[in-house]
Each structure stands twice: as structure tokens, then as C-alpha cells.
Amino acid sequence: MEFILPDSVMNILSRLETDGFSAFVAGGAVRDTIMGKTPHDYDIATSARPEEVKKLFRRTIDTGIKHGTVTVVHNKTGYEVTTFRTDGEYSDGRHPQSVSFVDNAREDCARRDFTINAMMYLPKTGIIDYFGGQRDIENKIIRCVGNPEKRFKEDALRMLRAIRFSAVLSFRIEDETWKAIKKCAVLIKKVSHERILEEVNKILLSENPDYIRKLHECGLLQYMMPELERCFGEPQ
């Protein structure tokens, strides 16, 4: 596949590198490009701390500075630039109470949800893939990074995202990841109705709207939409 990055993204990467920082395109943009799709947006991961990012660029917005994210506005478009980090405890089952900034790209990739979203890219180094994301794309598999049960206990929305990615991409959910969803299903109650509906709508609008049945099969539906669950009977 060929990576053709927008000029604005190249300029941001170049500026960070010129000042001695590591910087990569990260996450969904890498996944989409590998799959031959045009990314909707480009997120950048860097060793630069938020205050350093703000010094380097003329127009920035503190969109998530607590978690290391600054939006850099370049040619009237915003690009999220996030410092490499590790996450602290997830006491609410959705968000880390704290984050620790790190200088290591691998540690940053290790905190991400699925292998297909845990890759980075830089023109001079190519794709950085510590957890087999390219292989899982080739084999059409949704797989958690690390221990899936731990990933879902950190952020319960990830269970629903796994099924949404499965529906949108027509990928299979890896066995251990699927088992962990079934085991942790009750935790979906910690997720707001708005976020649940957002993910469910994406499933229904995908090429596999029938994947809504998977919400029943893994036990999520009974906690999300009990009135709809009754249409299916008992979870498998």
C-alpha cells in the first residue's frame, strides 16, 4: 500500500522532528491506509509534551490536555497531537484517572484497544507494528492488545467497539476477545446511553446490520436494551 499524507500532516511531523521529538501518524489513519481506504482524519502521536507542542505551533486548542492531547490547527483543519503515554487506573470503567507521559512509542501502542488500531507510521521508517495489526488486517481479525479482559475492564465501551469494527470491516472477533466480552458484558452499564446509541447506529448503518445479533449472543444487549433483548430470547 502507498501512504500519501496530506501536506499539513507532513508539516506537523516535520516540525516536531526538526525540534528533536519523535512523531508518527497513529491509529485509525494507519489502519485505513493499509486497507486501501482514505482516512477521515489523521491523529499524531509524539514524544513532545503538550506544552512543547503548544510552543511549536501558532494555533492550538487544548482539546484534551489532561490526557496529553492538543489540537494543532493547520490550514483551517484541526489535527489531534497526543503525547506518548501510559494510562493509570480506570476507576469509572471508562476513563483513566491519570496518565503518565512517556518517550517510548511501544508503551503508547500497548495502551490502545485493538491491534488494528495500535500501529504507527512515519515516511522514513514505514509502518511500526508491535502487536501484529497488519497480520490481523490480512486475516480479518479483531483482537485486543494484551489481555482482553483487562482492556474491557479499563473501558467497557471497547466491547461494543469490537462488535462495531467487526460489522463495519466484516472482520471476525478473535476467540479470547469474544470470551472476554461475554465475561465482562455487565460492565457495559457504565457506558452512557448516548455513546451506546452512537455505536449501535454505526452497526446498523454498516454492511452487516445483522451483526446487531452479536450484541445478543455475547450478552451485551440485555444490559444495553433489555426491551430489544426480549425479541431474541436467552443469550447464548
Predicted regions and their residues:
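Catalytic cores of the polymerase beta-like nucleotidyltransferase superfamily
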Residues: M1-Q236
